[in-house]
């Protein structure tokens, strides 16, 4: 039986019912709906709608229902109830009879679903924060094990300057640190209770909403009922957080897909996160990483879809807002799964140090060092830049590295170049010179690892 049938003389068309009902996805809010209902029952005692005995009877029945839901949440899907609120109320009435019909006094599904969704989001944020932190830890652990793994750094996907695999890991650690911070900020804004705002104008009962918020574990209660039942900013923020986080994971995946390719061959992925070809026996495909990269698009789509759903809605509640859940549920599930999978990839990764170093020594990645050397000799940087460009052209013509050019050849481009240039052009020197904060020198990378460990402690 629908919760709103009294106004209607005809039953809903079955096709409309299937189109309208949301239990198939909002059943995931069952625990939150029950918790919110327990809180509301306590509030109704304070305004003399329920006696203490009635409230205790309702709470006991709701607690029992919560245990059932936690044991088998998908059993809810066997019902033909319209939504999770209807299901909980109908089950409650089965347990306590007509007393269950009193629980919805002064409450609307509009403030009820807003409360359920915020409680669910709070729980999801706690899980996501843990997952982000676990991947941060995995990146720091991998960085610490690969401080001496020198590899090319890239701009425009062309070798630019030498870095280390540790420095690369720490770059993604910084991105994930920002992801964590965004989740924490989002939690601060959504941690306000909608319950007691009714359909749109507030409840007619003198409920102490701040006390109710405290019972439910919120920091405070919302301040405007019209805004409260219409507000889905927290959904947009979480989808934005997930979208940004997935962009970071997609870039992480793309880098490792390239590093794992035969063309780069900097790393080898574990058999545990790769698959083969049904035709080509030699193939070892980076499927885990490709799926992370591919799943980024569906999360971006969920954010865009929710933006478009909300952009034209008048105040207050509209049924369009039922579309807030499926995309959110899927996006956060996807983000969580990809965080876990990225950590699994790092667990078994093998860095091929000799090949990484060989690649770092190619591509004239020490050209900037030669330019800096000339500047130290008094040559203006723009002129030094031009001189080094000419020297690189000559090195390419001879098929040699810059440091392999004879001194006489180098001096054709600038007379200030002396024998002391060769130690400057050495690979380790290129790293050692990048000793400012955030740089790739061994000392700075070690310091960054230590700092990251402290932040994770």
From Swiss-Prot:
**Superkingdom as given in the UniProt entry:** Bacteria
Biological-process GO terms, alphabetical: arginine biosynthetic process via ornithine; L-arginine biosynthetic process
Reaction equations catalysed = 2-(N(omega)-L-arginino)succinate = fumarate + L-arginine
> Where in the cell is the protein located?
Cytoplasm
Q: Which UniProt keywords apply?
A: Amino-acid biosynthesis, Arginine biosynthesis, Cytoplasm, Lyase
Molecular function GO labels: argininosuccinate lyase activity
Q: Which InterPro entries match?
A: Arg_succ_lyase_C, Argininosuccinate_lyase, Fumarase/histidase_N, Fumarate_lyase_CS, Fumarate_lyase_fam, Fumarate_lyase_N, L-Aspartase-like
Pathway(s) annotated for this protein in UniProt:
Amino-acid biosynthesis; L-arginine biosynthesis; L-arginine from L-ornithine and carbamoyl phosphate: step 3/3
Q: Does the keyword Lyase apply?
A: yes
Family matches, as Gene3D superfamilies: Fumarase/aspartase (C-terminal domain), Fumarase/aspartase (Central domain), Fumarase/aspartase (N-terminal domain)
Main EC class the enzyme belongs to: lyase
Which EC number(s) does the record attach to this protein? 4.3.2.1
Q: Which NCBIfam families match?
A: argH, PRK12308.1
Family of the protein in this entry: Belongs to the lyase 1 family. Argininosuccinate lyase subfamily.
Q: Which HAMAP family match?
A: Arg_succ_lyase (MF_00006)
PANTHER family associated with the record: ARGININOSUCCINATE LYASE
Q: What is this protein called?
A: Argininosuccinate lyase
Q: Which gene encodes it?
A: argH
């Amino acid at each position: 039986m629908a919760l709103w049938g009294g106004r209607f003389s005809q039953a809903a068309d079955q096709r409309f019912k299937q189109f309208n009902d949301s239990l198939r996805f909002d059943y995931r809010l069952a625990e939150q709906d029950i918790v919110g209902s327990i809180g509301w029952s306590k509030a109704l005692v304070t305004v003399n709608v329920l006696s203490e005995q009635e409230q205790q009877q309702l709470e006991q029945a709701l607690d029992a229902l919560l245990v059932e839901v936690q044991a088998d949440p998908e059993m809810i899907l066997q019902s033909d109830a319209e939504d999770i609120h209807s299901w909980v109320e109908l089950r409650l009435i089965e347990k306590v009879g007509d007393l269950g019909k009193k629980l919805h006094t002064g409450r609307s599904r509009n403030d009820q679903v807003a409360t359920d969704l915020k409680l669910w989001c709070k729980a999801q944020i706690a899980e996501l924060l843990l997952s982000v932190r676990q991947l941060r830890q995995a990146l720091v652990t991998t960085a610490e094990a690969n401080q001496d793994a020198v590899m090319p750094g890239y701009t425009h996907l062309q070798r630019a300057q030498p870095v280390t695999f540790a420095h690369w890991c720490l770059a993604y650690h910084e991105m994930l640190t920002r992801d964590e911070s965004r989740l924490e900020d989002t939690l601060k804004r959504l941690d306000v209770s909608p319950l007691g705002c009714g359909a749109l104008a507030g409840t007619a009962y003198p409920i102490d909403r701040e006390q109710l918020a405290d019972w439910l574990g919120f920091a405070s209660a919302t301040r405007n009922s019209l805004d409260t039942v219409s507000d889905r900013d927290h959904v947009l923020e979480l989808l934005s957080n997930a979208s940004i986080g997935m962009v970071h994971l997609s870039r992480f995946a793309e880098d490792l897909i390239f590093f794992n390719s035969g063309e780069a061959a900097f790393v080898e992925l574990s058999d545990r996160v790769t698959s083969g070809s049904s035709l080509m026996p030699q193939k070892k495909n980076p499927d885990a990483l490709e799926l992370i990269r591919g799943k980024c698009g569906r999360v971006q789509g969920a954010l865009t879809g929710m933006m478009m759903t909300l952009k034209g809605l008048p105040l207050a509640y509209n049924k369009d807002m039922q579309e807030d859940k499926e995309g959110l549920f899927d996006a956060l599930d996807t983000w969580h799964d990809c965080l876990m999978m990225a950590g699994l990839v790092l667990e078994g990764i093998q860095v091929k140090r000799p090949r990484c170093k060989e690649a770092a020594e190619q591509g004239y990645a020490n050209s900037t060092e030669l330019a800096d050397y000339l500047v130290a000799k008094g040559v203006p940087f723009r002129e030094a830049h031009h001189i080094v460009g000419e020297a690189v052209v000559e090195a390419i013509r001879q098929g040699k590295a810059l440091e392999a050019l004879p001194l006489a050849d180098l001096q054709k481009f600038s007379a200030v170049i002396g024998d002391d240039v060769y130690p400057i052009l050495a690979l380790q020197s290129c790293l050692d010179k990048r000793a400012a904060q955030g740089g790739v020198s061994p000392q700075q990378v070690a310091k960054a690892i230590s700092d990251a460990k402290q932040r994770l402690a």
